[in-house]
């Protein structure tokens, strides 16, 4: 067991992953994640989720394509389900923990990006993170997925369930 201490220089969502001699295997086994650093006086959302987008190629001879995963799992129903209620302040943090570029798309909802523009499909690169933060106003079952079609087809998708 190791304990690490640091003084963060800036707020944000920071990805971590293994850098040891077997880092590819260890990352495939799930040795990655995110650390969220908030500003001291930041308003904490009512509901918060962290989604790590990444690929994984099983070590099987002849397998031609990688799984496209969310938090180590692939395909809606197997990936994390984001849950909230109408009226709640929801923050979904999405981070790329592989070497791919991704587009996060959430059906049925829009929010303001860091520049103040309305979006429902922001792009981000390796090691980068974005946040979809909004007041939930549209009940139902909504799909989220990577808008890179090969990633979506490979399983990078999940559900968001909004209760009235």
Regions found by a protein language model. Give the residues of each.
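Copper-binding active sites and cupredoxin-like electron-transfer domains
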Residues: 1-164
